[in-house]
Amino acid sequence: MPEHATLPYVLERLTDAEALARAQALAGRLKQRRTCRDFSPAPVPRAVIQAAIAAAGSAPSGANHQPWHFAVIGSPDRKRAIRAAAEAEERRFYGTDGDDPKAGAEWLAALRELGTDADKPFLEIAPWLIVVFAQRKGGIAEDGQTQNYYVNESVGIACGMLLATLHEAGLATLTHTPSPMGFLREICGRPEWEKPVMIIVAGHPAPDATVPAHALRKKPLAQIASWL
């Protein structure tokens, strides 16, 4: 191993029983997470969102370059602009703009069980939109020149940690990926070497919020894991 600076790494040592209890408790809470499309406008403290993003920013990344940026939108005007641009793309996706849909018949059929359409009122109603950007270049210094590595993998892990932390904080979330979504770079004022990845909507669910029954169908552990 090449010579490099190091620091001690110490974790709390748990008994097997404690480790299992913690893992099962967290798994139980995360299994309650759902994608929410019915949000309340009730405010959420900025500090809660900041803490969740700080957790996401601790994710592992290629060469520790941390190739992500989280643009947090609370401004009603910017939320309105994002909704207008996103719904325009969604109308093209679903074919409700008068032209043939961009999405294939199989894709649209798969979405039918989730009840989605081109209307995205949650983009204005929820108190916070977190627009996640992947940085193709920049390194830790964000100089716009240094190459970043494993960008998609790194940003994906960070997004998962962000969603988990927001759920732990008692917030509902939704991931929205309009396609294309280049308009987000302009609205958020981000540089050209950053690529928008998704919008994470965060807030409290509306009192009458529902989720599709189909969303509760999860693959069993025996199907998603193999032991070799």
For each feature predicted by the language model, list its residue ranges.
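C-terminal helix-cap and adjacent tail motif
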Residues: 2-18, 22, 198-228
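Short connector loops at helix/strand junctions that flank enzyme active sites
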Residues: 65-67, 123-127, 195
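Glycine/small-residue-rich phosphate/adenosyl-binding loop
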Residues: 2, 72-155
